[in-house]
Amino acid sequence: MAAELYPASINTNLPNSNSTAVTAASKKTIVQVTQTVTTPTTTATQQNINNNNVETASWQSTHPTLRERNALMFNNELMADVHFVVGPPGASQKVPAHKYVLAVGSSVFGAMFYGDLAEGESEIHIPDVEPAAFLILLKYMYSDEIELEADTVLATLYAAKKYIVPALAKACVTFLETSLEAKNACVLLSQSRLFEEPELTLRCWEVIDAQAELALHSEGFCEIDLQTLEIILKRETLNTREAVVFQAALDWAVAECKRQGLGPTARNKRAVLGKALYLVRIPTMTLEEFANGAAQSDVLTLEETHDVFLWYTAANKPKLEFPLQKRKGLTPQRCHRFQSSAYRSNQWRYRGRCDSIQFAVDKRIFIAGLGLYGSSGGKAEYSVKIELKRQGVTLAQNLTKFISDGSSNTFSVWFEHPVQVEQDTFYTVSAVLDGNELSYFGQEGMTEVQCGKVTFQFQCSSDSTNGTGVQGGQIPELVFYA
């Protein structure tokens, strides 16, 4: 009778290969990740082909290193003394292997084949691991090569955890951290908790907090489990409006109704949300947001809707089950690159020209906006287009206005959403102002600025056509979250 091997402690509720959990699936990304571990020589497609191409009886002499000879045995029937039937019934794949190689690479396999309770079965069923992930695991154990792809990395992490292969697990986590963005952060949060990867969990929270609106509007948010939903809705540092949180909860409820085979009626949405609904801080919405959104959703009872309206308007406020305190969100930090500001006649003037500067940071941050100088001649309004680019590619831009009061203070202008900025890479920020008034400008600029735990470096930008550079000019501040 064939043996069956199930995980001892890890939940098998994994996303399938079509999950949206990881979306950075370009081949370039894969190569970059594998280079930090080893040099790949076999593609993922080739891994599904038996390696039974031993040319001659003296094949050992043509493969001089132990690593080459071992690699040749990967997925090879030659001398195989065990077979695995990997994957669920109907979608399984038979994989040949060699007990000794597996045992020296994994304590789980060591105990399985050579421990006190070793089984003598020649065919072992592993229904909870995807075949592609199992082949990646075996390839690493035979050759030290790791090649990860977006659609299999979570399943590979599961396999690496199950068979206690920490180097492969670490490579998977690194890949996930590299590909982490707002649209997959919520799904990866649920998986990082499942796999007990605290560093990945922390990175997910950084993205979800700073880019909360993007994360909550993503398709991936609707795929999370109820427990992860509740954890996110409790989050004090979500940096978004409560109306966005409420709508995200409704979107999740619609998806959950479909998963449970229910129609997305108001009653069913309320039922699948359960107590999670009371984690939304409805009273912290503006009256207009509540009246045009939650009050018309039909998810709240008539009594709840009535009481919330009274809470907004009545002196004697009713007791509500919803939290009353506004979320703290994130406090924006400001990197100021000038030591002083000044004003001289005929400077700083705007004629539709671009003020621009390049910067790099030593840790990942989220750029939320820019601080700009305003008029030196009293109150004035400026139209401004701000832009953030990396290697010539526009990552974010916004066309807006700001009013200055005649002081030398900086005035914040914001991108629509905070933008993730990676470490050790130069980015370009630009501002094109339109206004008749002369403005203040910065001087005694610094090439390096320490701002909290983040170090900024500045250099001149070739895009700057209005005089701004490292030593002086516009764009005195970068506004960011870290």
Swiss-Prot record:
Nucleus in keyword set: yes
Keyword list, A-Z: Cytoplasm, Developmental protein, Differentiation, Neurogenesis, Nucleus, Ubl conjugation pathway
Domain BTB as annotated: residue spans: 80-150
Tissue expression: In embryos, expressed in the cranial ganglia.
GO biological process terms, semicolon-separated: neurogenesis
Keyword NADP: no
InterPro entries referenced in this protein's UniProt entry, alphabetically: BACK, BTB/POZ_dom, BTB_POZ_BTBD6, PHR, PHR_sf, SKP1/BTB/POZ_sf
Native source species: Danio rerio (Zebrafish)
PROSITE patterns: BTB
Source domain of life: Eukaryota
Function summary: Adapter protein for the cul3 E3 ubiquitin-protein ligase complex. Promotes the export of zbtb16/plzf from the nucleus to the cytoplasm and targets zbtb16/plzf for ubiquitination and degradation. Up-regulates neurog1 expression and antagonizes zbtb16/plzf, to promote neurogenesis.
Cellular compartment(s): Cytoplasm; Nucleus
Subunit description: Interacts with cul3. Interacts (via BTB domain) with zbtb16/plzf.
A single cellular component GO annotation: nucleus
Protein name as it appears in the record: BTB/POZ domain-containing protein 6-B
Family annotation (Pfam families): BACK, BTB, PHR
